[in-house]
């Protein structure tokens, strides 16, 4: 559901920025670095609710989740996601935000960073019961994340080929004439 939601957010952002006469690439560069903080709190909420728990483990950090179908110790994968997709990705994007990247590069870097973090965490997360494992022992989430990583790399390569004008900054659009 996250991957579809991301497509919806990008489509809505494209529509809003276009309607307001604002550059989507500049808006993304401003907003995207802070977006991972939302995952941190969302995944902590998943942990508190005992949902989206991890795979069975013998690790000393394993926990029993009341909503799991058994009383086995499981990885607290929600916390792994909060740390990797949330805190670590935020720190990375925030530290890179003022570097001389092409306009819009934050979205490409986000796609690669989130896709990589989620792909790795999926090895510890219990797959959705109605989906299970798909191709080559990977979860659907991992396959979708591989697509995100590829899309991020392609987008970055595309952005590098565009002519780079100095950013105009986000400003109030001029009033439209009737």
Model regions: which residues?
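A feature for loop-to-transmembrane-helix boundaries and adjacent hydrophobic helices
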Residues: 1-178
């Amino acid at each position: 559901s996250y991957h579809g939601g991301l497509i919806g957010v990008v489509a809505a952002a494209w529509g809003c920025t276009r309607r307001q006469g604002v550059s989507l690439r500049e808006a993304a560069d401003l907003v995207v670095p802070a977006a991972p903080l939302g995952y941190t709190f969302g995944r902590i909420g998943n942990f508190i609710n005992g949902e989206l728990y991890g795979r069975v483990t013998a690790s000393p950090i394993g926990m029993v989740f009341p909503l799991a179908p058994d009383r086995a110790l499981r990885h607290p994968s929600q916390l792994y996601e909060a740390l990797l997709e949330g805190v670590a990705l935020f720190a990375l994007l925030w530290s890179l935000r003022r570097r001389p990247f092409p306009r819009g590069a934050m979205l490409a870097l986000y796609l690669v960073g989130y896709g990589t973090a989620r792909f790795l965490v999926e090895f510890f997360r219990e797959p959705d019961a109605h989906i299970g494992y798909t191709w080559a022992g990977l979860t659907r989430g991992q396959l979708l994340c591989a697509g995100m990583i590829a899309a991020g790399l392609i987008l970055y390569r595309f952005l590098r080929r565009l002519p780079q004008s100095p950013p105009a900054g986000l400003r109030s659009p001029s009033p439209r004439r009737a």
